């Protein structure tokens, strides 16, 4: 059965990724390369961004569930699956050969509320290591790409707008919560762009043809 096969494939990939990531998090490392830019110091800490940051998890899960159980287009499922697998693989390789970390998390919080309490919990469970490129950024963009390129969702403007808004807020949250440096975000976005060019080439070629067609039409009208 197609759904069963997709489930098995996703479970196997996720299990391998979790095991390898756990190894990278706990392996002995003599020194980490510190990731930091001056832009990180300009971005203020804002605990309210914990909301979109945590929404990343249901956003990912619900999108994957949709492509496994509800979307009948096998090609679109594999576009998303291979894109996510590519990003995770690059992330694991980078983390292995280039151990990295950041020191931009605040030691004191400007306010005391439920949002800062959740951030404190996040800091206690998520180490500031292996952050380059940002998987939060890459996966959010990969999910957004899959939804906007889904044939059955082509006319669902609300879903596309909601996905775009949430993706933008998730990316911003990684910086405002001091979970990632600007470099991590840029590298995650670059990796997502690479994935788009590789796994959605038809969309790229169609866009290029549209631009060329408009240019030819404009020149004809001028003549």
Residue map of PLM features:
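Single conserved hydrophobic/aromatic residue that forms the stacking wall/gate
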Residues: 1-12
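Membrane-interfacial, low-structure loops and terminal tails that flank and connect transmembrane helices
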Residues: 5, 206-223
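Aromatic-anchored segments of alpha-helical transmembrane domains
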Residues: 18-23, 88-94, 165-175
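Membrane-interface loops
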Residues: 24-38, 70-153, 207-211, 215
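Interfacial helix-start motif at the membrane-water boundary
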Residues: 41-61
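Alpha-helical transmembrane segments of integral membrane proteins
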Residues: 51-54, 58, 79-83, 133, ...
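Internal transmembrane alpha-helix with an interfacial aromatic "cap," most often the third helix
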Residues: 58-75
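Membrane-embedded catalytic cores of phosphoryl/pyrophosphoryl-handling enzymes
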Residues: 120-209
């Amino acid at each position: 059965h197609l759904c069963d096969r997709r489930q098995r494939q996703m479970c196997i990939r996720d299990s391998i990724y979790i095991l390898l990531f756990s190894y990278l998090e706990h392996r002995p490392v003599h020194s980490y390369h510190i990731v930091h830019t001056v832009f990180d110091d300009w971005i203020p800490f804002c605990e309210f961004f914990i909301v979109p940051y945590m929404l990343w998890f249901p956003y990912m899960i619900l999108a994957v569930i949709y492509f496994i159980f509800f979307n009948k287009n096998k090609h679109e499922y594999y576009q998303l699956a291979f894109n996510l697998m590519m990003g995770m693989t690059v992330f694991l390789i980078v983390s292995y050969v280039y151990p990295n970390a950041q020191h931009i998390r605040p030691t004191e919080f400007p306010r005391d509320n439920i949002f800062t309490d959740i951030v404190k919990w996040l800091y206690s469970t998520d180490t500031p290591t292996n952050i380059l490129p940002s998987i939060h950024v890459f996966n959010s963009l990969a999910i957004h790409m899959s939804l906007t390129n889904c044939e059955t969702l082509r006319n669902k403007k609300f879903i596309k707008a909601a996905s775009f808004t949430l993706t933008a807020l998730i990316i911003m949250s990684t910086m405002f919560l001091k979970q990632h440096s600007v470099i991590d975000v840029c590298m995650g976005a670059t990796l997502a762009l690479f994935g788009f060019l590789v796994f959605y080439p038809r969309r790229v070629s169609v866009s290029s043809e549209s631009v060329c067609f408009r240019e030819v039409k404009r020149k004809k009208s001028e003549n």
